[in-house]
A protein has these predicted regions:
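Conserved, structured core segments of small domains
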Residues: 1-102
């Protein structure tokens, strides 16, 4: 199953986001587990400051997807004011392949 996740940061969490970013990236890019990241990145406010997270990933089921998100260092640091996990049903193929950037 495909999932999308949107996490909106609590106000004043930019310092926490920057301090936790490396471990967050390692967690979401871990291809050894049952979850496979397709794409993702920080959401930005009008001024360009990071203020949230977007992830699109594949997981066997909703429970596994939720466990993956609960183990994310961003979540464990208490960074999010809100979190939304939704199943995603692909209706149209993407015109280009999504690739993971470093």
């Amino acid at each position: 199953m495909y999932f999308i996740f949107i996490g909106k940061d609590k106000p004043g969490m930019l310092k926490t986001r920057k301090a936790t970013r490396a471990t967050h990236r390692k967690h979401v890019r871990n291809s050894d587990g049952p979850v496979r990241l397709m794409t993702g990145g920080p959401l930005a406010g009008k001024g360009g400051e990071m203020n949230g997270t977007f992830l699109m990933f594949e997981a066997p089921d909703h429970e596994t997807a939720q466990e993956f998100l609960d183990a994310d260092p961003y979540h464990q640091a208490g960074m999010f004011a809100s979190r939304e996990l939704r199943a995603f049903h692909e209706a149209a193929e993407l015109p280009v392949a999504l690739t993971q950037s470093n």
